Amino acid sequence: MNINLTLIGQAIAFAFFVAFCMKFVWPPLINAISERQRKIADGLNAAEKAKADLADAQAQVKQELDAAKAQAAQLIEQANRRAAQLIEEARTQAAAEGERIRQQAKEAVDQEINSAREELRQQVAALVVTGAEKILNQQVDAEAHNAMLSQLAAKL
């Protein structure tokens, strides 16, 4: 056997094998590798986008949380102001009611004083009439002297 002829035969077989692999085996492998690279790149891009979206969502959540806290603080402040206003209104109403009750009591006391004075005047007038009857030993007509007794009672 000749080594040169074997070597040439092997080289030709190897060339056919390489041509066959380049024609039928290599393109699917390159496509699979390209597809895998594309999927990995897409996955990395999606991960970066998801990371950016997560950061945006966290910023938005923080912003909404801050807004909710501010709104809650505003509502609490508004409720406190309303409570203070209601307390002040209740104080004003209580003061007005107290003043009204005091005024009614004063009017009732004044009325009682006037009633007592009038009753006292009538009693004094009756005593004066009785005293005058005893002094004069005669009956004094109360209706005839009513004006005089009224003047006397008014002076008392």
From Swiss-Prot:
Topology in membrane: Single-pass membrane protein
Major localization listed first in the record, in broad terms: membrane
Short name of any one Pfam family annotated for the protein: ATP-synt_B
InterPro entries for this protein: ATP_synth_B-like_membr_sf, ATP_synth_b/b'su_bac/chlpt, ATP_synth_F0_bsu_bac, ATP_synthase_B_chain
Top-rank taxon, per record: Bacteria
GO cellular component: plasma membrane; proton-transporting ATP synthase complex
tRNA-binding as UniProt keyword: no
Keyword Cell membrane in annotation: yes
Entries under SUPFAM superfamilies matching the protein: F1F0 ATP synthase subunit B, membrane domain (SSF81573)
Cell location: Cell inner membrane
Keywords: ATP synthesis, Cell inner membrane, Cell membrane, CF(0), Hydrogen ion transport, Ion transport, Membrane, Transmembrane, Transmembrane helix, Transport
Chain ranges passing through the membrane: 5-25
Gene Ontology MF terms: proton-transporting ATP synthase activity, rotational mechanism; proton-transporting ATPase activity, rotational mechanism
Quaternary structure, from the entry: F-type ATPases have 2 components, F(1) - the catalytic core - and F(0) - the membrane proton channel. F(1) has five subunits: alpha(3), beta(3), gamma(1), delta(1), epsilon(1). F(0) has three main subunits: a(1), b(2) and c(10-14). The alpha and beta chains form an alternating ring which encloses part of the gamma chain. F(1) is attached to F(0) by a central stalk formed by the gamma and epsilon chains, while a peripheral stalk is formed by the delta and b chains.
Protein name as annotated: ATP synthase subunit b
Gene encoding the protein: atpF
